[in-house]
Amino acid sequence: MSELIKIAVDAMGGDGSPEKIIKGIIHNHSSNKENFFKIFGNEKEIQKYLNNQIDTKFFEIIPTDNMVKSTDSPLEGAKRGKNTSMWLSIESVKKKEADIVVSAGNTGALLVIAKLNLKMIENIDKPALSALWPNKNGMSVVLDLGANIECSSKNLSDFSIMGASLYKSLYPSETPNVALLNIGSEELKGNEVIKETFQLMNENKKKNFNFSGYIEGNELMNGKVNVIVSDGFTGNVALKTAEGTANFITGELRKALSGSLIAKISSILNFSNLKKFKKRLDPRLYNGAIFIGLDTPVVKSHGGTDYIGFSNSIDVCNRIVKGCLLYTSPSPRDAHESRMPSSA
């Protein structure tokens, strides 16, 4: 058996934990035997849900009864001490006992604890929260989705480097095509920070990724670009708007196809296509946001997802490690020049 990817798992974070976390691990392991899980949390509860469904050579339980609560502020979560499942799982990456960490817990606390334990990549000032979004041609990396409400032009330029690196690690055969989210596509549109960022990215673009200028909100999923950069406030609003729109569409479609006998017959005749459509809009299949900018990425699962969603966040961990994002980072000169790090 080849060397396994070691994934540290905060089993106590998120709604319905540790049950959904352990079920997510079991679901993922049923189709992927490349991972070794270091599971942090209440040992009795974890063993109950594992129920001997995974061979012990694929996991280890590190027991702790302490956890960060969803209601904690970021500082309250950090002050709960070094014995929480979240802290210990991140610390295991710091100690090189695991390759990457995933948690469905409190987002603010996760970022603070990660920054207390892990180093920032040289010349990167702020980490960014990134995620994969579906588009007409495949997937896009979008960042920042809420880690930084206010950003300088340098921060946004750094995000373009990190986002391009992440996309390249996940899709090695493709060239990252970066765009800056704005209220218009013309160069004169936007505030001063956006305009300064445009100039930085336009002047410093390198062959490692393409810069396509501005992109508007109605173009986020048209597939023309695959890395979209914004500040955390704008990105989070865009994310929540997209999620709400997807839920609205699926809800209205469900009502339309169950309102009459003809509609029900139509839904039966189009079952295969409707199933594909529903799957394409299923947020669980895109679960797994990534804090990048730290010397080891931290994967954040949505706290409200189910075991299938958590399983997908494990897949994200696996792909990040295999794509060598962990071993690539911009040097000071490269970061200033908006140059994407080469693969290890």
Predicted features, each with a name:
Residues 327-332:
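Conserved small/polar residues in nucleotide/adenosyl-binding loops
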Residues 24-28, 109, 113-129, 196-200, ...:
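A glycine- and small-aliphatic-rich helix-loop capping segment at beta-alpha/alpha-beta transitions
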Residues 131-167, 284, 310:
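Short, glycine-/small-residue-rich phosphate/pyrophosphate-handling segment
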Residues 54-98:
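Phosphate/nucleotide-donor binding subsite
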Residues 93-111, 189, 194-200, 204-277:
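Glycine-rich phosphate-binding loop
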Residues 150-213:
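Glycine-rich phosphate/diphosphate-binding loop of Rossmann-like nucleotide-binding domains
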Residues 2-45:
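N-terminal phosphate-binding or glycine-rich loops at protein starts, especially the Walker A/P-loop
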